[in-house]
Amino acid sequence: MKIICSKSNLLKSVSISLKAVPSKTTMPILECILIDATTNQIKFTTNDMELGIETIVEGTIEEKGMVALNAKIFYEIIRRLPDNDVTIKTDEKFAATITCEKAKFNIPGKSGEDFAYLPMIERDEPLTISQYTLKNMIYQTIFSIAVNDNNKLMTGELFEIKNLSLIHISEPTRHSLI
């Protein structure tokens, strides 16, 4: 695999994806970020088995491929690179070479085939809602959202679309009626 991206695009995508990398896990592959350049776009995927994030990065694919790299090490390398184009190249043993101007880093990688993939989500027609309406919906339920992130699912709100109607659900964790 060989891809070329700007540092700013890489850093933005990696920092977003880093939110789904667990700090402690019994599965080392979950500490990785999957770089997938097997199609015509570059995808970064992270997954902690509760939360999964996929970002698409603008860049050039010179050789198609896929590799899983340690997400925190990869982020620290990208963060310290000069503001220029970054080349990421892997060999047949999944070792990655990251170069930017005079900087060159070699880090071991893993096969992307071992990575825990995200489920496919059908993306139908987009829903348009006014900012005022969305703000009011969130304002009316924000009090019930968990403050700590022991369970990440409880720190958000669920929006469902059924029969052209928007259903808004907030899981009451702090404020429950008994």
Task: Give the location of each predicted region.
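Structural preference for solvent-exposed beta-strand-turn elements
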Residues: 1-166, 170, 174
